[in-house]
Amino acid sequence: MMMASVMQAAEKLDLKSITSGAFSASYVTGINPIEGTDLYASISSDGKQVVSYSFKTGKQVAVLFDVEAAKAPMKSVEGYVMSPDGKKMLVFTKSKAVYRRSFKAEYFIYDIARKTIKKLSEGENQQVATWSPDSRHIAFVKDNNIFVTDGEKEVQVTKDGKFNEVINGIPDWVYEEEFAFNRAFAWNADGTSLGWIRFDESHVKTYSLQLFEGAKPTRSEFHDYPGEYSYKYPKAGQDNSKVSLWSYDMKTGKTLALDVPVDVDGYYPRIKTTPDANSLIVYTMNRHQDDMRLYSVNPFTGKSKQLIQESVPKFIKEEVMENSIVGKKNILLPSDRDGYMHLYLYDMNGKLIRQVEKGNYDVTAIYGMDEKTGDIYFQAAMLNAHDRQVYVAHKNGKVERLTSQEGSNSAYFSGDYRYFVNNWSNYSHPYVYTVRNNKGKVIKTLEDNKKLLEKTKQYNWGKRETFTFTTSEGVKLDGWMVKPVDFDASKKYPVILFQYSGPGSQQVLNSWSTGSMGSGGAFDYYLAQEGFIVACVDGRGTGARGAEFEKCTYLRLGDLESKDQVETALYMGSLPYVDKGNIGIWGWSYGGFNTLMSMSEGRPVFKAGVAVAPPTCYRFYDTVYTERYMRTPQENEEGYKVNPIERADKQHGALLICHGLADDNVHPQNTFEYSEALVQADKDFKELWYTNRNHGISGGNTRNHLLRQITNWFKDKMK
């Protein structure tokens, strides 16, 4: 009786609230450790100030920038970059996304002591503005060209940049998307030279997206006739950009071609500063992405020498480049060469000093190395695959855990490595930010999201239960499920499986970010409120279980992943409280691909499914991602035939496909071609298109509408 009255008093979740951010957590934003100090800077919650805080006390030290006090021509600051000497900062506003990681913005130079502000450059907004190590100059990209300025005089370094032809200092689309970076230049140690990657994409084939007037935002230029956005997108097996390396001498104003060996069709996925003014570090990768090399190149002579070669079976993960560190004395490189992702320490000449730590677990992030003490700070899935803790590895080989609570922990370390800001969460608790010393002791709580936690208790916010089962092939898989709040084990419930399933990904992770649409999995709890059990299982190919588990899908994407989702449906159907005739599946992007693969696997276990923005044949996807896991279509014809289009005649269950017409990542072509295959196979299905929306399908009321269609589809077909 009491339980019933409590449940009746609980407020009901609604999609409008979920998609409008009513359950969004509070963050400590823009955390930026100030180099060589125990201070960090952060943007205030109203975006009006950049404030410095003490790691030691957690207290505010100074206001570094104030929009009103500086009389800055902006409503709020969206981001900032401190100069290395701490005397100035770049602040930017009016940022506008280009692709996933890139943006253009209006940058300003602010002198902290003098409280003066000036525009970085006139004309087109700028990208990736970066201080020189001596704090005297700033390099940035505008209109595909590199510029440098001292705040008074601006020099244009390159002049051949042109949209869809030549790019200087920023990556092309596929490099940005798949090698995960947005700046392709680096200063040398004393700021006397600048090195960069030049992309000649003139011969790369173009893909065009059709644009309409639409709404929110309205594109009035397309009021009567649609327009197009055309850009260079290399598909699997096709030509990539031709890349070359260059340097600019700040004293002479001369440019020089740098000679760093790379295959004709290979990659330059990183360029980095070193402590030696006569050296930049350049990474190279072969097209198969199973051989990576680090070179030291002299920006004044153009000559290079190889330092490190990393070769592993099948492929090198992109995270190896993202997490590697070039320090003052050492280079730290992650590698799964022994079957798990671990850390390897080299000297600046490329000589291996030691393996930093070892065990049957994966290192998942690197936070830095204190070269004074030899301590190395990192994140790892050491307790289990769905847990993340922060650790320190000492020079003597001892590894200590610095975070205390199970769940997901990440860190931002101070410039002197004496303190860090810890961000912790788990399935049921939103983010908690605490300041800790480098022994792990909590000094102060910065944000605990108590208000959000209390709010979730006012709604039908269920509990995410974890489970493990073994497939008919003997594979042990981990999952979670959310049951209706009024769950009755004597009843039978329909089930919706959510999954992503892509290489190295994880959805079964003890974190507030886990769940189909973020916000603590609010959409999952909404579906549970509507009477469904929502479940998720990470199948073969997903991350944090070692190289063998992750790389077993190599050359046949979608084969094992779809089998594991079918096995998940069979397992769920065996539970006494599940209606095995009413099991559905859905996913976004790779999850959409695997939804289609699972619904055509051959065992008709799914009553309904929804595929959002799905790749339907990897010949249509980009070179870097696809070939990393599949090689080229010319080399792996049979592997590429493992796709939803080829098995459209096996598709079963009620199918809804949703796609944005302006998706620059997974092109609408994928859904167009798949729907034609379904038509010819005489299969019923429904399509839903979103005008001018990209891969994220958001803007205005779009996300609310999309989630309502997904919900209603499962309600109509399964209840």
Predicted feature residues:
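Predominantly five- to eight-bladed beta-propeller fold
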Residues: 15, 21, 58-59, 94-99, ...
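Serine-hydrolase catalytic core recognition
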Residues: 18, 277, 410-719
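Signature of short aromatic-glycine-proline-rich micro-motifs recurring in repeat-based ectodomains
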Residues: 26-31, 75-81, 170-190, 270-271, ...
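Non-catalytic accessory segments flanking enzyme active sites
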Residues: 28-32, 43-52, 62-64, 78-79, ...
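Beta-strand C-termini and the immediately following turn/loop, strongest in propeller blades
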Residues: 41-47, 54, 82, 89-101, ...
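Short loop/turn segments that connect beta-strands within beta-propeller blades
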Residues: 55-58, 111-115, 150-153, 249-253, ...
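Blade-loop segments of beta-propeller domains
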Residues: 59-86, 91, 96, 122-127, ...
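Asp-box/WD-like beta-propeller blade repeats and closely related beta-sheet repeat scaffolds
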Residues: 101-148, 153-184
